[in-house]
Amino acid sequence: LNNLIKSYKNNYEYTDQVRTLVNSILKNPEFIGGTVSFDTKVIKASKGKIFCKSGAEGVFLFVDFQKEISGVIKITDGNERAIPIAILNIFKKFKVMSKVELKNLEKKEKFELKNHAGRNIGRVSLTMK
């Protein structure tokens, strides 16, 4: 991710292509994951300041090119339902997004777990060390 930041900010052989790709996604967040994916919601909530992408088996990466902050998380059991709560807490802790942006993003996420009958059976939460 540090190399992605360098490629975006400096003049390397592929800098123009990297900027074109990243800027296209930041201006059109649906390109990265459709209309309801968490990555699309993050890009929209940050007003195009944070590039991010979720991957298979509970992987999520993010880059803020202006602040030069980047990170990757991996949910050990591969279940993606923990990604939003983990990312929201990381963004809060490291002030990646403003309080208003975080609140707007958090409103769009559901952390309650329901069974097939629609009954509430728990909640996804995070304990950070």
Segment roles from a protein language model:
Residues 2, 6-129:
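Structured C-terminal helix/loop/strand segments within mature extracytoplasmic catalytic/sensor domains
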